[in-house]
């Protein structure tokens, strides 16, 4: 199969409450976006002004208020707060209600969302193995009438998902390193990563790992949706476009700086110490729509087929209208 080129909207659940965020998701469909994704956080990156609506009821509400857009998580962790069997049931239900429109995006998680509940936070190798096992359980529950599974970390006994969609809900794996990227190539229907990092990370590590996983599974890039979350900040005034990124400064922290942080107040303290130039380093910051198009196009040229745009500002309606009217038509014309 050939993967179509799609352009989506990242709904900032760490920045907006559920009702306002829902209106943005509906507007994204009206403005011509192809998909709406959100993360599933128990706590936001920033304490002051932060939000953290749960993704699961929100996706159901968004599906009911839209007709066309793909809806999904980017990403959800099915290994600590949730048992994988519960996630299998939830997304099977969503798949029945909104056939062909639902994506389950999963990742290994962050301490921010797990430790506060008294849950353990193991080292990266165990988190990776937990994710593999969770995906196995979810797929078996979706495929089988009666499932018993005894794994290292999870088990199910005589389990049945009674309401399953005719069309399987695709699983996308979010990854920022080669191991999880390779796993996406081997077993997933989609791969998610984020923009604004060293270009060599994509060309020398991540995409070769994806291709290696695909090759081991006898697949090609045409068999997997490659999704890039593209961080963008547009405003006619450059200083304003730059300052908009301040709320999302935690994205500029390294994995070593933030992975073990479980408190939004501490995360905010670390982020506030960053100069604005570093806070903005993950974003395409520009006052020129043509520059946005040129810099976004580089990710298409790398082979990504699904670009999901995340704007850091508080005026999401302005962003959605500007991107829908100015950027998406230019991108579609360029890659027609």
From Swiss-Prot:
UniProt xrefs under Gene3D superfamilies: Luciferase-like domain (3.20.20.30)
Source superkingdom: Bacteria
UniProt catalytic activity: oxidized coenzyme F420-(gamma-L-Glu)(n) + D-glucose 6-phosphate + H(+) = 6-phospho-D-glucono-1,5-lactone + reduced coenzyme F420-(gamma-L-Glu)(n)
EC class name: oxidoreductase
Residues binding coenzyme F420-(gamma-Glu)n, per UniProt: 40, 77, 108-109, 113, 176-177, 179-180
Pfam families tied to this protein: Bac_luciferase
Role, per record: Catalyzes the coenzyme F420-dependent oxidation of glucose 6-phosphate (G6P) to 6-phosphogluconolactone.
Subunit structure: Homodimer.
Similarity section: Belongs to the F420-dependent glucose-6-phosphate dehydrogenase family.
HAMAP family: F420_G6P_DH (MF_02123)
PANTHER family: 5,10-METHYLENETETRAHYDROMETHANOPTERIN REDUCTASE (PTHR43244:SF1), PTHR43244
Protein name: F420-dependent glucose-6-phosphate dehydrogenase
């Amino acid at each position: 199969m050939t993967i179509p080129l799609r352009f989506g909207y990242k709904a900032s659940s760490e920045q907006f409450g559920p009702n306002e965020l829902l209106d943005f998701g509906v507007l994204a469909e009206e403005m011509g976006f192809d998909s709406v994704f959100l993360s599933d956080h128990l706590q936001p990156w920033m304490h002051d002004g932060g939000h953290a609506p749960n993704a699961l009821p929100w996706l159901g509400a968004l599906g009911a208020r839209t007709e066309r857009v793909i809806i999904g998580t980017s990403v959800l962790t099915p290994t600590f707060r949730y048992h994988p069997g519960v996630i299998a049931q939830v997304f099977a239900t969503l798949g029945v209600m909104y056939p062909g429109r639902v994506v389950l995006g999963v990742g290994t998680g962050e301490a921010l969302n797990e430790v506060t509940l008294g849950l353990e936070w193991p080292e990266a190798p165990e988190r990776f193995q937990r994710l593999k096992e969770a995906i196995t359980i979810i797929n078996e529950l979706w495929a089988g009438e009666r499932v018993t599974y005894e794994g290292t970390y999870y088990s199910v006994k005589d389990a049945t998902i009674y309401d399953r969609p005719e069309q399987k809900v695709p699983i996308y794996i979010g990854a920022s390193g080669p191991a999880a990227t390779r796993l996406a190539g081997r077993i997933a229907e989609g791969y998610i990563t984020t923009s604004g990092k060293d270009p060599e990370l994509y060309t020398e590590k991540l995409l070769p790992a994806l291709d290696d996983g695909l090759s081991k599974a006898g697949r090609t890039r045409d068999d997997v949706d490659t999704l890039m979350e593209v961080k963008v900040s547009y405003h006619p005034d450059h200083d304003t476009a730059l300052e908009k990124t301040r709320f999302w400064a935690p994205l500029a922290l390294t994995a070593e700086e933030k992975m073990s942080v479980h408190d939004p107040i501490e995360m905010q303290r670390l982020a506030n110490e960053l100069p604005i130039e570093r806070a903005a380093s993950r974003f395409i910051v520009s006052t020129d729509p043509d520059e946005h198009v040129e810099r976004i196009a580089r990710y298409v040229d790398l082979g990504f087929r699904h670009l999901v745009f995340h704007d850091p500002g508080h005026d999401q309606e302005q962003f959605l209208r500007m991107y829908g009217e100015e950027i998406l038509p230019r991108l579609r014309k360029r890659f027609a």
